Every structure is written in structure tokens, then in C-alpha cells.
Amino acid sequence: MSATDPIQRVETLLQPILDAMGLELVELEFKKVGRSYLLRVFIDKPDGVNLDDCAEVSRELSVQLDVEDCIASRYTLEVSSPGLDRPLKKEQDFIRYQGRLAVVKTTELLKDEKGSPRKTFLGFLEGVEDGEVMIRLKEGPQARIPWDKIAKAHLEFEF
């Protein structure tokens, strides 16, 4: 069983549930753990999700998964918030979290304003402009990272 088929089917079942509750799908994971699988669903909303949101999505999705029987193997369903180190995947995420500390990793070496090459950028999100994510680095200079050069990005918790 390929991991992409169940993910697509789960997302199709999940999206109407989330839409009805005013929630956003942040990420879906489906991976083999021992002899069974783990289906992990990360959800969010502007003012954050709570335990009741997670429980309701879990109940609703469980019913749909049982009815549709789209995962043939044994699995465990987990529904949670994306946490403090929330992944940033969509352009809207970078806009929504302007001013927040984030880590952006790129697919290749890029230069910041001072010409220093790097693949990891730690700084404060300043938005998106002309297909580039703008980030004010903790050490001062700004970097503009082309959208297609972003390998991975997530919020970073500030102590």
C-alpha cells in the first residue's frame, strides 16, 4: 500500500469536516510504525485549537474512515495542534505569522543582504512579496528567499 493513496483519500474525507468546524488542515502524516500504521492529523485555526476541537475531528474522521474503509491495515489515528514549532507550508502561513521567529531551510545556498551564503535562515518573518519570503535574520540583515527554494520552514519557539 502506498502512503500517498491513503493520504489523498483521508484528505478528501477530512476537508468537509474541517470546513464545517472552521479549521485548517496543516499537515497529514501516514507512516508505518511497527506492524501497524500511524495516521497523524495536524489542525489549526486563527485563535488556536483546543482539546475539544481535536476530539471532535477525531470522532468525525473515525466514523468516515470506518464507513469508507480506505485504510486496509491496522492504524492509530492522532489529531493534534501543530504545536509551538508549527510547520509553515503555504504562502498564507508566512503572512499570518509575520513578526514571529521562524527557521527557513533552503534547497541550496542563498545569500543574505550582506552576501553571506547559507541554507538555514533563523529570523523574524516579514511577509511575502514577489514570490519571495522576507525574513529579518536574528543577527540583523534581511534575506529574501524565493518560494521555490524553500525546502522546509517552521515557527521557532522564543524563550
Swiss-Prot record:
Q: What is the lineage of its organism?
A: Bacteria, Pseudomonadati, Thermodesulfobacteriota, Desulfuromonadia, Geobacterales
Q: Name one Pfam family in it.
A: DUF150_C
Q: What is this protein called?
A: Ribosome maturation factor RimP
Role: Required for maturation of 30S ribosomal subunits.
> Which Cys residues form disulphide pairs?
none
What's the family?
Belongs to the RimP family.
The answer to whether UniProt assigns keyword Plastid to this entry is: no
Q: Give GO terms for biological process.
A: ribosomal small subunit assembly; translation
Membrane-crossing residue ranges in chain numbering: none
* One cellular-component annotation, GO: cytosol
Q: Where in the cell is it found?
A: Cytoplasm
Organism expressing this protein natively: Trichlorobacter lovleyi (strain ATCC BAA-1151 / DSM 17278 / SZ)
What keywords appear on the UniProt entry? Cytoplasm, Ribosome biogenesis
